[in-house]
Amino acid sequence: MHAKSLTELRAALAAKECSAVELAQLYLKRIDAARDLNAFVHVDADLTLAQAKAADAELARGAGGPLTGVPIAHKDVFVTRGWRSTAGSKMLENYQSPFDATVVARLQAAGMVTLGKTNMDEFAMGSSNENSAFGAVKNPWDTHAVPGGSSGGSSAAVAARLAPAATGTDTGGSIRQPASFAGVTGIKPTYGRVSRYGMIAFASSLDQGGPMAQSASDCALLLNAMAGFDERDSTSLERDDEDFTRHLGQPWTAGSDAARPLAGLRIGLPNEYFGAGLADDVRATIDAALKQYEALGATLVPVSLPKTELSIPVYYVIAPAEASSNLSRFDGVRFGHRAAQYGDLLDMYKKSRAEGFGPEVKRRILVGTYVLSHGYYDAYYLQAQKIRRIIAQDFQEAFKSCDVIMGPASPTVAWDLGAKGDDPVQMYLADIYTLSVSLAGLPGMSVPCGFGAGANAKRPVGLQIIGNYFNEARMLQVADAFQRATDWHKQVPAGV
């Protein structure tokens, strides 16, 4: 039962093969048995089973929708009433929100049952889920490896089938990279598609929530429930409701046939995504996936994204600048960690923040404060914003000759736990293929497409699919066609 997709689980509930309570109990037992992975930071069986009972009551009345009674885990960056909401930080280790984030509320309104809160890099700052105040998360495929970050708890939970789906957030790649490392499917929607209300902020012009699950079809179902305008989020976009499942299983064009369902699809391959720095085993796996797309009828087209290499310095100016402002609210006064001993008010601020924040968060606050300071704002922050606009223009130029862009989600497979902890720059370089997508506000997703080679033979590789603004339904169609022709997304770690 635990290996079933969301659609299969909902069908099992409708057929009375199990109840929502029994399903929740199954996953709670699996979570408890896999505590060594450290994927979850907070589980409350009573709260979960209460939601499951309510879902069973809905189903008994013949009511409910396509997700009623199906369990989900939430990244601990979404505030969730009843559960602690920590953002992976000591600063918020005992914080309980009086309200639900819009994403949480919408999924609960769709009938989903919350299993608990997943581990994450502190305030979503990291690429390995080693920056959490609650300990590192292990990759279920190889427990010596990282699961990616910052949504590493969510990716590990879905990969180990501790939950059929999970929420994540993506600021510079934090859905796509962990999805790649853990062999699951994850999508970052267009910026503004999913409400940020109740999402603990890192970098407000970049943060975006999205689903992580086994397949593109599962992600489409989840996005149906998650997306939509929210007047409480000033960056939320007013658009008509959309069915993200509407193209699944359909031919790309009227001239496509069953053997070549993607005939007419043009896939752009950026030269910059296949150059120096891309590991040989990742390149080989991505090449094999692209050949599969050609077999499905797609055409490969060379494109260029010339400012790709600048996305790292641009991101690491803009994101820390916004973080230094957003995290200024955590001062030990209204909420958050407060130092036990201090002199005056200023001393309390200093000690509370020094004790509450981890080293990576402190590093980014310092960088952000510096680039916003007098004399450096124009040289760094303003210049970064100008290049950000050029990066977005490069994508629009590329989309003139293709429908979607593809490439690796990460230049390597997951690295060993602790391998990059002493070298933050090497950690930052791991996001080179995802950062520009976030800076442009475009939708991007990662789908499992194989594994590394040699010593990395147990470590998954993800194919990144990038679409133009509001093109999620077509991206999901493209990913779904690949998953109908392959079974990479159905493979699970040993023992699962």
From Swiss-Prot:
Function, in words: Allows the formation of correctly charged Gln-tRNA(Gln) through the transamidation of misacylated Glu-tRNA(Gln) in organisms which lack glutaminyl-tRNA synthetase. The reaction takes place in the presence of glutamine and ATP through an activated gamma-phospho-Glu-tRNA(Gln).
Reactions mediated catalytically: L-glutamyl-tRNA(Gln) + L-glutamine + ATP + H2O = L-glutaminyl-tRNA(Gln) + L-glutamate + ADP + phosphate + H(+)
Molecular function via GO: ATP binding; glutaminyl-tRNA synthase (glutamine-hydrolyzing) activity
HAMAP family (alphabetical): GatA
Active-site residues annotated for this sequence: K75 (charge relay system), S150 (charge relay system), S174 (acyl-ester intermediate)
Biological process terms in GO annotation: translation
SUPFAM superfamilies listed in its UniProt record: Amidase signature (AS) enzymes
Protein name as catalogued: Glutamyl-tRNA(Gln) amidotransferase subunit A
EC number: 6.3.5.7
CC terms in the record's Gene Ontology section: glutamyl-tRNA(Gln) amidotransferase complex
Keywords, alphabetical: ATP-binding, Ligase, Nucleotide-binding, Protein biosynthesis
Subunit structure: Heterotrimer of A, B and C subunits.
Family: Belongs to the amidase family. GatA subfamily.
